[in-house]
A protein has these predicted regions:
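Zn2+-dependent peptidoglycan hydrolase active-site motif and core
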Residues: 43-46, 60-102, 129-134
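Short, surface-exposed secondary-structure edge patches
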Residues: 55-58, 102-109
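Surface-exposed, glycine-biased beta-strand/turn segments
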Residues: 1-77, 113
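Residue-level recognition of beta-strand microenvironments
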Residues: 30, 69-70, 100-103, 120-123, ...
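Conserved, short, structured surface segments that act as functional micro-motifs
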Residues: 76-84, 89-91, 107-151
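Non-catalytic surface loops within mature trypsin-like serine protease
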Residues: 33, 52-54, 86, 101-102, ...
């Protein structure tokens, strides 16, 4: 893996990922089919929305490298993506965090699980402060709750 001329070999160690928000946060929209709050039609929701307050810290769910940190015009607003490498089955794991108020990391930076990567906000297609959190396996969306602890 090469970013800005530096080569990395990433391995996702597996296990439970860190919740990307404060403990007091709550899921405001689950993964799967839902009535889109802005478009008003039934659509698949590719992640989970976790509510909170503007400026709340958003944490890296696992160790990795920042591969995207910018405003996304496709509706995600301020967005960060982290490549966590390949798991033991050779599946590439990437997490996505969207609608941030302020981005705190740049492409190519390494992060540890629990590092603050952005501040929660409501940028892009959003109805209030939250983080939209996705987990992707080889580019395909999966339910993030499968990776997160129950509490």
């Amino acid at each position: 893996y090469t970013i800005n001329g530096s080569t990395y070999e990433l391995k996702y160690s597996g296990g439970v990922m860190f919740w990307p928000t404060l403990e007091r946060s709550y899921i405001t929209s689950p993964y799967g089919s839902r009535l889109h709050p802005i478009q008003g039609v039934i659509k698949n929701h590719d992640g989970i929305d976790i509510g909170g307050s503007t400026g709340d810290p958003v944490y890296a769910a696992a160790d990795g490298i920042i591969i995207y940190s910018a405003f996304n015009t496709g509706g995600y607003g301020n967005m960060v993506m982290i490549d966590h490498g390949l798991n033991s089955e050779g599946v590439k794991i990437v997490t996505l965090y969207a609608h941030g108020d302020k981005l705190l990391k740049s492409v190519g930076e390494t992060v540890k699980q629990g590092d603050v990567i952005m501040e929660m906000g409501s940028t892009g297609n959003s109805t209030g402060p939250h983080v939209h959190f996705e987990v992707r396996e080889n580019g395909s969306h999966v339910d993030p709750k499968n990776y997160l602890s129950a509490s």
